[in-house]
Amino acid sequence: MENLVALTQEALKLVADAGDLNALEAVRVDYLGKKGHITALMKNLGGLSPEERPAAGAEINKAKDAVQEALNTRKQLLEQAAINAKLASEVVDVSLPGRGLHTGGLHPVTRTLQRIEEIFAAVGYSVEEGPEIEDDYHNFEALNIPSHHPARAMHDTFYVDDTHVLRTHTSPVQVRTMENKKPPIRVICPGRVYRCDSDMTHSPMFHQVEGLVVDKNISFADLKGTMDQFLKAFFEADVPVRFRPSYFPFTEPSAEMDIQCTQCRGKGCRVCKSTGWLEVGGCGMVHPEVFNASGVDPETYTGFAFGMGVERLAMLRYGVNDLRLFFENDLRFLKQF
């Protein structure tokens, strides 16, 4: 039993000195494992007399319990120390300033489209869309553009085949709307359009928004008032607006819309080519032939239509002088919006 006391004290000292869980496990195996020093004493009980065995067995079990309890206590301390060390290594210094997230932004053309839609939605217009590959009838014939019209030429239009084109305007959406809905109609038709043209102010693909109003007793005065109020709302300024007589095969009478130059306030500059005015779109009263082709009675209803280039409006609103910047995906340009 003297050997038992020495082994117990030795085991307890090693437990107390164990610096990590691996060292602690090694102590347990050495003293309480199947071949451990204290476990081996139990195997020697057979050499004692029957009278001595119970007392000796009780002493050995008491020693085992003492060592096991010390092991458990030390294990808890070491585990907690490991957790504390891990937490200390992963601590977040809340006094540091936060790092801002680099979020994306909307493209200026998208911003412009959304702004146009919001302005017209506020006065009761709905948004209509249509196919970008359009048939000859809806892109030309139904809009009073006969086969001999210059717009049909290959140098102006992208032809997919003999009877289909990449739409040259969103006016076909107006025709489809009149075919499928009965007046009164108040819609705008935004979307991509395609033309054989490319320079600083033109792109083979660009965005256009057209509008259509059909009802009884619609007049040119309604058109002028609508466009005047829209342009003032869009540019957030009391910009002077003028209408110049023009020609479009699908409207009669027709007009071009100009606003006073936003750069020189009408005095004349390089942007407006010294005229003091900037063109923003075309408009007019819907031609009776377009009504007939769309199934609307021109004797009962009248209407007006207008069309504007979205990139053109974006250029004027944001002061951009080259249309191609909108399509180059240059972050130095896009981050400004």
Curated annotation (Swiss-Prot):
Pfam families: Phe_tRNA-synt_N, tRNA-synt_2d. GO terms for biological process: phenylalanyl-tRNA aminoacylation. It is found in: Cytoplasm. Binds 2 magnesium ions per tetramer. The keyword Protein biosynthesis applies. One of its GO terms (cellular component) is cytoplasm. It catalyses: tRNA(Phe) + L-phenylalanine + ATP = L-phenylalanyl-tRNA(Phe) + AMP + diphosphate + H(+). HAMAP family: Phe_tRNA_synth_alpha1. Belongs to the class-II aminoacyl-tRNA synthetase family. Phe-tRNA synthetase alpha subunit type 1 subfamily. Tetramer of two alpha and two beta subunits. This is Phenylalanine--tRNA ligase alpha subunit. It comes from Cellvibrio japonicus (strain Ueda107). The lineage of its organism: Bacteria, Pseudomonadati, Pseudomonadota, Gammaproteobacteria, Cellvibrionales.
